[in-house]
Regions:
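N-terminal secretory signal peptides that target proteins for export/translocation
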Residues: 1-10
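Bacterial N-terminal signal peptides
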Residues: 12-24
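Short, low-complexity N-terminal intrinsically disordered segments enriched in polar/charged residues
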Residues: 24-60
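Solvent-exposed, acidic/flexible segments
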Residues: 31-38, 50, 69-73, 89, ...
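Short solvent-exposed beta->alpha transition segments
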Residues: 58-116
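Exposed beta-sheet edge and beta->alpha loop/turn motif
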Residues: 104-163
Length: 163
């Protein structure tokens, strides 16, 4: 039971950090369009997560990070290291449901993330690959011109959520 809980937390951490990677450089080239900033970094963030670039991903978490599980930035970094060591390969498949900006320096992302040990080409492969499916609600903050994850919550998802 403890191992299962730790594995679920690891999935959550990796996926959260993936989302952070998506938005981390958003301030550089498209300063006037935050939504375009978030969307333009999807491929870059996926690459960082799949290539296990832990240092890059860790830099994308706010020092003020906290979540409903009582985790802070240090706890997330520790879990991330464990997850990256435990999994030989990581492949992600994402669907953004919504990006909202309640304030100029705050963003809320609602997205679906599937994780598997093999590449996921489309929604039809999710069941065959037995991918772990999650829905994430992530709050981002722009700190000194860079987007960082401030809070993230997740729950299990169904294949239909990806359609």
């Amino acid at each position: 039971m403890a191992e299962r809980k730790r594995a679920l937390t690891c999935h959550w951490v990796l996926t959260t950090l993936f989302v952070v990677a998506l938005v981390s450089g958003a301030c550089s080239s498209d300063r006037d369009n935050p939504e375009k900033q978030v969307r333009s970094l999807l491929a870059q963030g996926e690459t960082a997560a799949e290539q296990k670039q832990a240092g890059t991903l860790r830099q994308m978490i706010s020092e003020k990070y906290s979540d409903s599980q009582g985790q802070d930035k240090k706890a997330i970094e520790s879990t991330l290291r464990y997850y990256l060591l435990r999994h030989q390969t990581i492949h992600l498949f994402t669907r953004i449901r919504e990006i909202a900006f309640p304030a100029p320096d705050l963003a809320h992302v609602d997205m679906m993330v599937a994780m598997a040990g093999q590449p996921i080409a489309n929604v039809g492969e999710l069941e065959r690959l037995q991918a772990d499916l999650h829905r994430f609600e992530i709050n981002l903050v722009r700190e000194q011109g860079e987007w960082k994850v401030l809070r993230a919550e997740w729950r299990r998802a169904e294949i239909g959520d990806f359609l």
